[in-house]
Regions:
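Conserved structural motif at the start of ABC-family nucleotide-binding domains
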Residues: 6, 20-23
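Helix-to-loop junction immediately C-terminal to a conserved catalytic motif
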Residues: 52
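Conserved ABC ATPase "signature" region
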Residues: 94, 109-127
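Conserved ABC ATPase signature
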Residues: 131-135
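Catalytic Walker B motif of ABC-type/P-loop ATPase nucleotide-binding domains
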Residues: 156-159
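H-loop/switch region of ABC-family ATPase nucleotide-binding domains
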Residues: 192-193
């Protein structure tokens, strides 16, 4: 991987002038899935919301391919248990195409192809005309990821996409996201507490600690330097704990 997708320069993040992390400098590559780990309150969700444009940076800059980031370049999937009454899976996923539709909001043949392909990518082919609320939490999460895929953005940010899911669905979703990153050349950044799965499945780990910035490296290298132990205050690889 050699194509830089996201690059930050002394990025400082927070809210209401309260600084959560300062002077963050990192680069993410096209075609990789990065899992962001760290203790609660260290700024993981704040970073995602800042990159997505939902809240302003306090200082510094961040770019995509050396250009200032635009909302149309990023898809964001937040953690939430949605209940959408009387709405089909197709209609939920189609919301991701609305920025590209005609003035009247009509879907073109290409839009429909993208919707079906996105559902196929998340393993939900044939579910277009089923109702969203009839699906399990894991399936709903995959529908929302399919919606993000239909936006055709080079970057997808996900905040705790496996929350509330059982282990098989957690594994399935992370494996699917890694495959999408590699096959479609997307940059996927995930905030998660799934330490074991992140270490096994991500290309790199972004390890964040309160007020101390981030370390971005492979899980093997971070373990070798003791970074995980320093971040979480204990030897997370000790089977006796």
């Amino acid at each position: 991987m050699c194509n830089v997708s996201i690059s930050t320069n002394n990025l400082t993040i927070g809210y209401n002038n309260h600084i959560v992390q300062r002077d963050l400098n990192f680069e993410l590559q096209a075609g990789e899935m990065v899992c962001m780990l760290g203790p609660n309150g260290c700024g993981k969700s704040t970073l995602l919301r800042t990159l997505a444009g939902l809240q302003p940076a306090i200082g510094g800059t961040f770019t995509i391919s050396n250009s200032l980031i635009e909302a149309s370049q990023i898809a964001l999937v937040l953690t939430e248990r949605l209940s959408i009454e009387n709405t089909t899976v197709h209609d939920v996923v189609a919301m991701g195409r609305y920025p590209y539709t005609s003035f009247l909001g009509g879907l073109s043949g290409r839009d429909e192809q993208i919707i079906e392909q996105s559902l196929s990518n998340v393993g939900l082919s044939g579910c277009s005309h089923t109702f969203f609320n009839d699906h399990s939490d894991g399936e709903k999460q995959r529908v929302l990821i399919a919606k993000a895929l239909t936006q055709e953005t080079p970057i997808i940010l996900l905040d705790e996409p496996t929350a509330h899911l059982d282990l098989p669905n957690r594994i399935r979703i992370l494996q699917m996201l890694r495959r999408v990153a590699r096959e479609q050349g997307k940059t996927i950044l995930i905030s998660t507490h799934e330490l074991d799965l992140a270490i096994q499945l991500s290309d790199r780990i972004m390890l964040m600690t309160p007020q101390k910035g981030i370390q971005l490296d492979t899980a093997t290298n971070l373990r070798a330097t003791g970074a995980f132990t320093a971040a979480f205050g204990m030897d997370i690889f000790n089977p006796c704990l």
